[in-house]
Amino acid sequence: MKNHTFKYLIIIIFLFLSCQESINKTRTTNITEEEKLLAKFEPEDGKCILFAGQELEAIGGLEKWNDGYYDHFDAPGGFTMYTDFSPGDTMFGYVLKGLDGVFSTDRWGDYPSNMSLQLEDEDFNNSALAIGLWLVNHEKEVADGIQDKLINRMGEWLKSLGRRPVFLRIGYEFGGGWNHYNREDYIRAYRRIKDKFDAMGVVNVAYVWQSHGWDEPMEMLESWYPGDEYVDWCGYSFFSRWDETNMIEFARKRGKPVFIAEASPTISTPTVKTNGKTKETIFSNPEQAKEAWEKWFVPFFNTINDNPDVVKAVSYINCNWKSHPMWFDNPTFQDVDARLQTSDFISKKWKAETSKELYLKASPDLFDKLWGEEK
């Protein structure tokens, strides 16, 4: 009898331990599955959406604007443009009306912008859209509801784009001194825009919180953060001081993907930290093109390759900066012509690098991939 009791006890203990192991395995599996959940429009690890920007000449692909990125390289996975909620402000003689560059061709010191031309052109049919939304001088008005008409108009327009993924960079480069945003008003404005769009049923937008990318301690980033429920992607700009960023670390801790939302070769001089001055970099100059590749492109691609779990989108600015009035007096961009197509050396290397399976370009199934069931 005692032997039978002992056997039964052993069997009960074995069954109990087996159940516990099964429960633990289930819990581990569930945790693993939760960790693999992707953000809105985030591709799987080891994939990166390639964008090009950031005005009509730089991007090309149109009958009138036909010497830009789309005319010399494979159509990218997305294109980057800009607009604003800053009606009444003047930029280089142009008076902003709000939503400039969305429905009409407008020029505010950069080269002309008009998203409607691109969205109506079949060459752009399979490319996502990234938008830099300027709020400068008006973040409090936006936060207080004074600009709700612009928010509503933009929301209806976004819905009209159907399944085209839109990456909306609200108040991009929020901490840059040149934007002089008020932190509290900026956060309130960011949240109001998203809340309004959510209430309107806008579902084709991923919300990107983008810093300028350098001289940003972790505590500073924390203080400007709108909150996990308001941010789909973290973003930053990749220019001359690319090695100073904390955004990748910040995003990884938050479980957010990273969009390098502005990237163009600018090479530091010894005084870059005091006056922002970068070296002359003109791609049609073979020596300067080689230096740009070694000192900027190599670190740029290394950043992508070294962070496949986080860096999931990048936007190259294919711009002749020095020819735009906006940048004539800007020490960072005034001596830069970063158009890839003006250098055979850089063009070949760019094509070789971006032809790797890592990069997502325009394709008939790109939107389906970005709209995956788990997103």
Predicted segments with their positions:
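N-terminal carbohydrate-binding/catalytic regions of secreted carbohydrate-active enzymes
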Residues: I49-S160, W296, W321-I346, T354
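C-terminal motif of bacterial Sec signal peptides marking the signal peptidase cleavage site
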Residues: L17-S18
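Structural preference for beta-strand elements that scaffold enzyme active sites
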Residues: G78-T80, N126-A130, P165-R169, N204-V208, ...
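Active-site beta-loop-alpha junctions enriched in small/polar residues
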Residues: G53-L56, Y82-S86, W134-V136, G171-E173, ...
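Glycoside hydrolase catalytic-domain groove-lining segments
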Residues: F103-E120, N125-S127, W233-V272
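Sec-dependent signal peptide recognition
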Residues: N3-I11
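Active-site cleft segment of glycoside hydrolase catalytic domains centered on the general acid/base Glu
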Residues: E141-V231, S240-K253, S323-T354
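Substrate-binding cleft of secreted/luminal carbohydrate-active enzymes
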Residues: G46-E57, V166, T269, T274-K375
